[in-house]
């Protein structure tokens, strides 16, 4: 098994273990998209207690999505004010997704989850996703800096 594949295996085990500590299930669905039309979603304990990711896509896209949804779990766990505010304000939702994407890309790098050959493609995919969020959300103006996420920095592979 090459290094990237081992890192991926370790990351899935790590995420599953962290979720289990909070009574949240990791649900990997054998489809290209999740039931709601997206690639994945995080449901808080009051709303289903699961982190779902469609696994029927490229491995790079799968791990990008898993990292993104895992960051939402970390935001929920830390009771992040931006995470809470994003439910009620479209501008905060865009800001949240921007911070989430930045953190997900950082996790992908820290864990070595994307081979060199796929890194540019994942960054492009991230930019396209943020553009689509911006287009879907009316009158979005982000005027704040991303909040520091202390917990995200400590997610490095040990």
Walk through the language-model features, giving the residues of each.
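Glycine-/proline-rich flexible loop or hinge segments
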Residues: 1, 48-53, 81-89
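Alpha-helix boundary/N-cap detector
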Residues: 2-6, 10, 95, 117, ...
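N-terminal cationic leader/targeting segments used for protein routing and processing
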Residues: 3, 21, 154-158
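Zn2+-dependent metallopeptidase catalytic core
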Residues: 4-22
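Active-site scaffold of zinc-dependent metalloenzymes
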Residues: 16-61, 73-77
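Long, well-structured alpha-helical subdomains associated
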Residues: 58-61, 105-158
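Post-HEXXH active-site segment of zinc metalloproteases
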Residues: 60, 76-106
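Short alpha-helical catalytic segment bearing the HExxH-like zincin motif
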Residues: 61-69
């Amino acid at each position: 098994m090459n290094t990237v594949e081992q890192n991926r295996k370790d990351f899935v085990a790590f995420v599953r273990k962290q979720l289990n500590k909070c009574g949240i299930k990791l649900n990997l669905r054998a489809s290209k998209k999740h039931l709601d039309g997206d690639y994945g979603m995080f449901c808080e304990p009051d709303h289903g207690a699961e982190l779902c990711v469609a696994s029927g896509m490229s491995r790079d896209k799968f791990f990008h999505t898993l990292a993104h949804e895992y960051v939402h779990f970390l935001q929920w766990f830390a009771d992040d004010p931006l995470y809470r505010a994003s439910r009620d304000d479209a501008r905060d939702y865009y800001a949240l997704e921007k911070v989430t994407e930045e953190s997900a890309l950082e996790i992908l790098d820290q864990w070595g989850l994307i081979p060199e050959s796929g890194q540019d493609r994942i960054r492009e995919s991230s930019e396209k996703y943020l553009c689509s969020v911006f287009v879907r959300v009316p009158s979005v103006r982000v005027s704040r800096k991303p909040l520091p996420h202390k917990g995200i920095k400590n997610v490095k592979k040990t």
